[in-house]
């Protein structure tokens, strides 16, 4: 008989695995084996007094050898049971139940059942010495207990199943019931099978967005705050640092932009002008260097020729006079010299004639006549034609040389790349590039409104008349009449052929192609750019002809007669049908 405060001492049935022995434990005992005498009083699950030894050993639940597994005791008992005798039948418990199986002969109202046929409702479903049937409802499914001998499938919402134990000996899952804190009686074990590793979905900054609270549903959450979406979360420090660096960089760039915007562009324009002037000077210097190079080459050739002539003269002098008939070099030298003198004399003659003409002009003081100007222009034109012919011949020679050079590279160097293609492409880009103007253009891109209106009027007048065409004028007839009707025939307060100030429909909400309120709506979508109210095809104060192509500006053309009625939909009050003649020739 266990006296005092005992916590979970006892055996399960006839099977004694605890190392405590069979003597009665006195005082505060934690996990020692008690004798088979029944406990009396308030006892937290002493597993004593086995009536009939059980044939099958099962682990009882408790913080030791068994917390809730004993025979029926008198008094207040939390889960008393007869460890050996399994309960035969008991009524199914409904509602919130810990699922510890009420014993067969227990009549205590506070006994938590151990063996039950079916537990429906919210149960914690611990498997003790009994054989539970199918449990339906919300169950934690063997939270911390070993599976019994025969366990059927649990239907319903299960939060557990076979989870892995969180420790070695403390939360083990063997089938033998041992005493102490590390046994497989109702210990704090979360399951029996191996853990399964799930791949974590990490988002920006290493945050697992799959565990966010916005993925939860209101139906599955037991608390109302579980279904609230998380609006603001703190970013990781790495991303915060990057954002701060980016903001600092943007701020610095804005400061640089402000400094640049405060600077004047005159200095840059002056530098640009200086660069242009330097380019011109460089081109002049390059042309001068080219001329000097040609002159140097020419002087080199002349110097070599003079050295040759001097050597010939020296040898001629040393040659005896009797052998001079075989020496033809002096004759060639004198012949070339005479030809040069002839060319120089012709140049001198031309220059002398020009000088005489100039002196004669200065002496006579005669004014230049238009014939002289025309003759000078003709001579300049002939000079340009001759230069163009020479340039064309030079261009053809350059093309031939380019082809020869490319053939040489392809033949001897094995390089078929056109080396002149890059320069040709650059020149083409330079030609096709638009010239950037430094200021607004003095010529407007918009056409003249008066010219467009005149052209529209002439075009309309040249077309054959297909109906009553109102003339250009001022009238309070057709356009000003506020007709109540639909169609293309105008109806108003005056005659229809008196013209009008841009004879389109009058003040009102027209039904010919218009859907909103407007000051004059026409029936053709190809009208001019008009100003006014409304959102139809061509709406507003349209002083143009909508029958022609679209023109820009405020034009004073002639429009097709279109009525304006105080109606926006179908035919409300049609006063007169349009005649068939007005529809001829229209597209």
From Swiss-Prot:
Membrane topology label: Peripheral membrane protein
BP term (GO), one: protein transport
Positions with biased composition (Basic and acidic residues): 213-234
Chain segments carrying region 14 X 2 AA repeats of F-G: 7-567
Stretches assigned to coiled coil: 244-264, 302-369
GO molecular function: identical protein binding; nuclear localization sequence binding; protein-containing complex binding; structural constituent of nuclear pore
InterPro entries assigned to the protein according to its UniProt record, in alphabetical order: NUP58/p45/49 (IPR024882)
Note: In rat, the p62 complex contains two different isoforms of NUP58. Isoform p45 has however not been isolated in mouse so far.
Domain comment in the entry: Contains FG repeats. FG repeats are interaction sites for karyopherins (importins, exportins) and form probably an affinity gradient, guiding the transport proteins unidirectionally with their cargo through the NPC. FG repeat regions are highly flexible and lack ordered secondary structure. The overall conservation of FG repeats regarding exact sequence, spacing, and repeat unit length is limited.
Family: Belongs to the NUP58 family.
Protein name: Nucleoporin p58/p45
Lineage of origin: Eukaryota, Metazoa, Chordata, Craniata, Vertebrata
């Amino acid at each position: 008989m266990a006296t005092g405060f005992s916590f979970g001492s006892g055996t399960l049935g006839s099977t004694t695995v605890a190392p405590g022995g069979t003597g009665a434990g006195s005082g505060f005992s934690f996990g020692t084996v008690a004798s088979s005498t029944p406990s009396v009083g308030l006892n937290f699950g002493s597993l004593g007094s086995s009536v009939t030894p059980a044939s099958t050993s099962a682990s009882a639940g408790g913080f030791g050898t068994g917390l809730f597994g004993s025979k029926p005791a008198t008094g207040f008992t939390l889960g008393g049971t007869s460890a050996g005798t399994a309960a035969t039948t008991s009524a199914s418990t409904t509602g919130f139940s810990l699922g510890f199986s009420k014993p067969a002969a227990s009549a205590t109202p506070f006994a938590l059942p151990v063996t039950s046929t079916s537990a429906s409702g919210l149960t914690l479903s611990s498997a003790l010495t009994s054989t539970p049937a199918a449990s339906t409802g919300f169950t934690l499914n063997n939270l911390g207990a070993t599976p019994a001998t025969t366990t059927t499938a649990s239907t319903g919402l299960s939060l557990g199943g076979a989870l892995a134990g969180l420790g070695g000996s403390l939360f083990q899952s063997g089938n033998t019931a041992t005493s102490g804190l590390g046994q497989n009686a109702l210990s704090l074990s979360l399951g029996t099978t191996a853990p399964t590793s799930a791949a974590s979905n990490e988002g920006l900054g290493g945050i697992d967005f799959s565990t966010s609270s916005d993925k939860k549903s209101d139906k599955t959450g037991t608390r109302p705050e579980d279904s609230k979406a998380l609006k603001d979360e703190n970013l990781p420090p790495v991303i915060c640092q990057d954002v701060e660096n980016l903001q600092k960089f943007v701020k610095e760039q804005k400061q640089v932009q402000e400094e640049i915007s405060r600077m004047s562009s005159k200095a840059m324009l002056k530098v640009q002008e200086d660069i242009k002037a330097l380019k011109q000077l460089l081109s002049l210097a390059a042309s001068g260097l080219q001329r000097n190079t040609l002159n140097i080459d020419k002087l080199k050739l002349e110097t070599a020729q003079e050295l040759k002539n001097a050597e010939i003269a020296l040898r001629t002098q040393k040659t005896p006079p009797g052998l001079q008939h075989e020496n033809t070099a002096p004759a060639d030298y004198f012949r070339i010299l005479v030809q040069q003198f002839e060319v120089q004399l012709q140049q001198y003659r031309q220059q002398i004639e020009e000088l005489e003409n100039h002196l004669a002009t200065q002496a006579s003081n005669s004014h230049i006549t238009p014939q002289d100007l025309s003759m000078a222009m003709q001579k300049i034109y002939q000079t340009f034609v001759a230069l163009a012919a020479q340039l064309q011949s030079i261009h053809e020679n350059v093309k031939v040389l380019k082809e020869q050079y490319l053939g040489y590279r392809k033949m001897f160097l094995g390089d078929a790349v056109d080396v002149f293609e890059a320069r040709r492409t650059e020149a083409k880009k330079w030609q096709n590039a638009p010239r950037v103007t430094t200021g607004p253009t003095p010529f407007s891109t918009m056409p003249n409104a008066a010219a467009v209106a005149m052209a529209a009027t002439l075009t309309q007048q040249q077309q054959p008349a297909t109906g009553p065409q109102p003339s250009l004028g001022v009238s309070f007839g057709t356009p000003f009449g506020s007709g109540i009707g639909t169609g293309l025939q105008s109806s108003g307060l005056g005659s229809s052929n008196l013209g009008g100030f841009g004879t389109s429909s009058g003040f009102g909400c027209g039904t010919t192609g218009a859907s909103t309120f407007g000051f004059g709506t026409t029936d053709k979508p190809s009208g001019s750019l008009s100003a006014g109210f409304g959102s139809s095809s061509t709406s507003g104060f349209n002083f143009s002809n909508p029958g022609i192509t679209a023109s820009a500006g405020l034009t004073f053309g002639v429009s097709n007669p279109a009525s304006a009625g105080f109606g926006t939909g179908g035919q409300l009050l049609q006063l007169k049908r349009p005649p068939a003649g007005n529809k001829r020739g229209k597209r």
